[in-house]
Amino acid sequence: LHVVQQMRQGGIVNSEGANVYTSSGHFVLANTRGFMAGYPYSRHSISVSPIARDASGMQRDDWYSSSRLHAELAAPEAVGEYAGRRALARLGARKLRTRQCPVLFEAPLACGLLGNFVQAASGGALYRKSSFFVDALGTQVFAPHLSIEEDPYLHRGPGSSPFDEEGVRGLQRKVVKDGRLEGYFLSTYAARKRGMKSTGNAGGSY
């Protein structure tokens, strides 16, 4: 209640709602090649989208906490307070003139950029030749200080899985090493179309 009062005094006037999500189950995959296996799963999350207002107008933002274990979720008060601060920080925003300058991306936006990278390095875009990464293995695609690792077996990782949607085991690997593209995300079909081997990514990255 104290946090809510502070947010109201600071300019939070409403919200677009808060959500609590929880699920658990057991996934089983069987196919005509004789593969059958499964694993238990769980996912829990809380989120909120507050609205801030001042003389310049209204702004909204959001924040969330997500984990395989509900005990590892951030406290609801902490999620709400941070979401409120994000909404308040948007008030009074103004446009910049066109310029060239370094840009620092916050974590959620950086994840979105990585999603664009995965899409461009995935089988469908590659065999249709609609990606700028066609035949780009070994070439410099990022700055030398950047490496991207895929680990399907990361303990309690949100995307961890012992196998993909075809029953193929995923690979612990560096997809980008020192800025160079070292691997693609391929299902068996996409791999055949490219004359390569499956990387265990039917259904996407881990």
What are the residue ranges of the model-derived segments?
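N-terminal small-residue-enriched
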Residues: 1-206
